[in-house]
Amino acid sequence: MTFNKISSEKGFTQVPLCLRKSKLSNLREYQNRIADIAKRSKAVLGWASTAQFGTDNQFIKDDAARAASILEAARKDPVFAGISDNATAQIATAWASALADYAAAHKSMPRPEILASCHQTLENCLIESTRNSMDATNKAMLESVAAEMMSVSDGVMRLPLFLAMILPVQLGAATADACTFIPVTRDQSDIYEVFNVAGSSFWFLCCW
């Protein structure tokens, strides 16, 4: 094992080089996480907050004009790539309204960690079906399901409405400022088929 001397208050001590490399690796992960939080929170603020103000930095009072500005800004976020304008507008305007209400009530914006966590959740839901790791059959099947779920038919709980509620619910949580948000790179669902055998009290599960 290789040792390197490092200074300390009482002189010198010896620390294994492998531990130093481990600490450097952890530091890089921390720095990458901080950079990711900054990037995601900036993206959310760009189309959910800044877009509500005109070029003169004045709040856009006309609802239609403000919604159009929010939609235009949201289109620039890669997370909405391939998503219809109708769904994008529904999600972005809901987040913008939630941010405005929060800022008015607390006189400040939410913590970057909260915005980044919501953006990550939004991304997971929107682009999960386009993962490169999927085979062609599964990808085609999930893309078909995603297209149906992006429908905004009246009276039906569809994906856009669910995604539109991510930030409002997070900002309304009483414990939001007391929590540490841990990033989740992807969601996973297991689909089970249940078989009931006649004359038996046992159930058989098949995971596929």
Swiss-Prot record:
Keywords: Plasmid. It comes from the Bacteria. This protein is thought to be cis acting and to contain the putative attachment site on the DNA for the cellular partition apparatus. This is Protein IncB. It comes from Escherichia coli.
